Amino acid sequence: MSKRDYYEVLGVSKSASKDEIKKAYRKLSKKYHPDINKEAGSDEKFKEVKEAYETLSDDQKRSQYDQFGHTDPNQGFGGGGFGGGGDFGGFGGFDDIFSSIFGGGARRRDPNAPRQGADLQYTMTLSFEEAAFGKEATIEIPREESCETCHGSGAKPGTDAKTCSHCGGSGQLNVEQSTPFGKVVNRRVCNYCSGTGKQIDHKCSTCGGSGKVRKRKKINVTIPAGVDDGQQLRVSGQGEPGVNGGPPGDLFVVFHVRSHEFFERDGDDIYCEMPLTFAQAALGDEIEVPTLHGKVKLKVPAGTQTGTKFRLKGKGVKNVRGYGQGDQHIVVRVVTPTNLTDNQKDIIRKFAEVSGNKPDEQEMSFFDKVKRAFKGE
């Protein structure tokens, strides 16, 4: 089954900005996250959204995707009917052909050279507050580690791995082939030792000759204050072990932040709505506003209208890179009373008689705008 277009997956245009891509990812990742959405297929959709975001959020990967799509540009013409693989199957690579004709030899990676281990990824779900303030956490991940029985050699204790008698330890075989240019020598991965350059006659019973076993490893992770949904933390050296003495890979912890019932977050800023009674809005009041840092008193001036915005400086989230602190923005919503008693209704009627039914100057300006809109002015 062919992959869907990454832009289509996120529901954005090809000219979408980084912010638009990030917002689309945050919305869809919350929608399809397995912890939230239990519907069949949501897990695959979550993976698809995540894969699309990882490509389109990286400038280099996005540029490569825009040019080549899902095709790997490093594969050349591979898989197009020349016998399989990116090196034209039976013909071998052009490097082999021309190096055999003109001498010198193409450079190939030494199979016995040290290589860095593979990177690992772990998804961690955080509460809204945990993401804002950070925390210490212990996670458990499955990963390959060096076999303690054979100390990573793959050979049964008391025996040793031998140099491959077929390739002489190089991990490659020279195969003579006929080409349109004549007979050339093509180098292939040794099929006897799978390119390792070693042969194990008596394999370790614990790891089966691989030299590695899969274990669950506990790792302590320090989550910095201010991480946001979709961001990732790199833990150096906690990936898969290296090959042939190479360094281990890294662990990337990807954060999924649960939504909050009262607060919303945009970057380092926090947003919330505060209800006011008609009396509070008309007469003014001092109210208590919940923040991530505790309750804060806010003076509401008389005559405050629905939609009025207030800002509490420094009451947002700490910037994850240490660049200051966000603010908390409060939007006022005046609540219309319901289920009034007869006495309350009489009081409001008297108030209406005293104040009149005509809107004040501020409301008049609003109604004037509405009238002009209808007239097309």
From Swiss-Prot:
Its cofactor is Zn(2+). Pfam families: DnaJ (PF00226), DnaJ_C (PF01556), DnaJ_CXXCXGXG (PF00684). It is found in: Cytoplasm. SUPFAM superfamilies: Chaperone J-domain, DnaJ/Hsp40 cysteine-rich domain, HSP40/DnaJ peptide-binding domain. Signal peptide: none annotated. One of its GO terms (biological process) is protein refolding. A zinc finger (CR-type) spans 134-216. CXXCXGXG motif repeats lie at residues 147-154, 164-171, 190-197, 204-211. The keyword Cytoplasm applies. Keywords: Chaperone, Cytoplasm, DNA replication, Metal-binding, Repeat, Stress response, Zinc, Zinc-finger. Residues 5-69 form the J domain. It comes from the Bacteria. Zn(2+) 1 binds at residues 147, 150, 204, 207. One of its GO terms (cellular component) is cytoplasm. Zn(2+) 2 binds at residues 164, 167, 190, 193. InterPro entries: DnaJ (IPR012724), DnaJ_C (IPR002939), DnaJ_domain (IPR001623), DnaJ_domain_CS (IPR018253), HSP40/DnaJ_pept-bd (IPR008971), HSP_DnaJ_Cys-rich_dom (IPR001305), HSP_DnaJ_Cys-rich_dom_sf (IPR036410), J_dom_sf (IPR036869). GO terms for molecular function: ATP binding; heat shock protein binding; unfolded protein binding; zinc ion binding. Binds 2 Zn(2+) ions per monomer. Belongs to the DnaJ family. Participates actively in the response to hyperosmotic and heat shock by preventing the aggregation of stress-denatured proteins and by disaggregating proteins, also in an autonomous, DnaK-independent fashion. Unfolded proteins bind initially to DnaJ; upon interaction with the DnaJ-bound protein, DnaK hydrolyzes its bound ATP, resulting in the formation of a stable complex. GrpE releases ADP from DnaK; ATP binding to DnaK triggers the release of the substrate protein, thus completing the reaction cycle. Homodimer. The J domain is necessary and sufficient to stimulate DnaK ATPase activity. Zinc center 1 plays an important role in the autonomous, DnaK-independent chaperone activity of DnaJ. Zinc center 2 is essential for interaction with DnaK and for DnaJ activity. This is Chaperone protein DnaJ. It comes from Bacillus pumilus (strain SAFR-032). The gene is dnaJ.
